[in-house]
């Protein structure tokens, strides 16, 4: 497994198109990514790959679906068991530390509970919800899962 201390270099090496602000954010949030991923039983590299695919490390981004922050969490989907019954606003989710924490909690919960430990199904569920679990093979066709896996492979394979 790769170690997170090299994330800055790996993203710089494998994604030269990233702007200097994005690369700075990778470095800036490494510690939080490592802490929250470990606390939630997921690989830091996987969480970093999710953040890259979701927001390219832009903390202020809001999608057309009202997903907010680095991990692109939709506020209305917070407040359940995934987030320990805490409801978050878009403003709160734009805080990088909060976004990393909440994204890690949701990804971990989805993978453990809904996907029964299956990483790709958990990633699909994080992005597209229940159809990833109920529609047989849906997760295998997910472009999102393929993107995250590609980024993850570069991070892990780049060491």
Would you name each region that the model predicts?
Residues 56-62, 110, 129-139:
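Secretory-pathway/luminal and periplasmic proteins that interact with or process carbohydrate-rich
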Residues 64-86, 103-105:
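Substrate-binding/active-site groove segments that recognize
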Residues 88-99:
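A short, structured beta-strand-centered segment in the mid-to-C-terminal lobe
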């Amino acid at each position: 497994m790769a170690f997170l201390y090299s994330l800055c270099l790996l993203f710089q090496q494998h994604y030269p198109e990233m702007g200097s602000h994005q690369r700075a954010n990778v470095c800036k949030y490494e510690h939080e990514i490592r802490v929250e991923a470990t606390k939630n039983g997921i690989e830091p590299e996987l969480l970093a790959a999710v953040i890259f695919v979701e927001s390219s490390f832009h903390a202020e981004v809001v999608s057309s679906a009202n997903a907010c922050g680095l991990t692109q969490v939709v506020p209305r989907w917070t407040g359940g068991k995934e987030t320990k019954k805490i409801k978050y606003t878009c403003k709160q989710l734009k805080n990088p530390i909060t976004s990393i924490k909440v994204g890690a909690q949701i990804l971990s919960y989805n993978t453990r509970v809904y996907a029964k430990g299956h990483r790709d199904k958990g990633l699909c569920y994080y992005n597209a919800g229940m159809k990833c679990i109920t529609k047989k093979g849906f997760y295998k066709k997910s472009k999102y899962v393929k993107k995250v896996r590609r980024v993850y492979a570069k991070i892990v394979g780049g060491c």
